[in-house]
């Protein structure tokens, strides 16, 4: 196991969260979301699960943070392509959306998973 030193400052905590996000994203991209566990994430980081729990409570929390990051990147891409224009011809509209998806290939996967996760983990 890697030498683990608990982050104390806000800056170090942000670095730890970024490490968690990167490791989780790698694991989510390599296989099924449902096959990834906090144990797998901790192992990928070289940490114990107890150390991981100091920063996150659930796998869903990590996933939703990644999803929001992907969503923000996708929306920013769309806004950049629209460049403040409101009246865009249909053909250009389709082209803008197609290019935005091409530049953000992971976003649709995360969006689909997000709906599945919410349906599975939220009771009405």
Map each language-model feature to its residues.
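Generic hydrophobic, amphipathic alpha-helix propensity
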Residues: 13-24, 41, 66-70, 74
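Long, hydrophobic, well-ordered secondary-structure blocks that form the structural core
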Residues: 54, 64-75, 80-84
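Amphipathic alpha-helical segments used for helix-helix packing
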Residues: 103-123
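N-terminal intrinsically disordered/low-complexity leader segments
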Residues: 1-15
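Hydrophobic alpha-helical connector segments
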Residues: 65, 80-107
């Amino acid at each position: 196991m890697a030498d683990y030193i608990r982050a104390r400052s806000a800056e170090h905590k942000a670095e730890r969260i970024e490490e968690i996000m990167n490791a989780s994203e790698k694991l989510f991209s390599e296989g099924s979301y449902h096959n990834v566990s906090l144990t797998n994430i901790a192992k990928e980081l070289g940490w114990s699960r107890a150390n991981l729990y100091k920063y996150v409570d659930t796998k869903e929390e990590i996933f939703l943070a990644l999803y929001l990051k992907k969503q923000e990147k996708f929306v920013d891409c769309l806004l950049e392509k629209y460049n403040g224009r409101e009246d865009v011809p249909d053909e250009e509209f389709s082209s803008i959306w197609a290019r935005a998806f091409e530049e953000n290939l992971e976003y649709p996967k995360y969006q689909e998973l997000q709906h599945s996760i919410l349906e599975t983990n939220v009771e009405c």
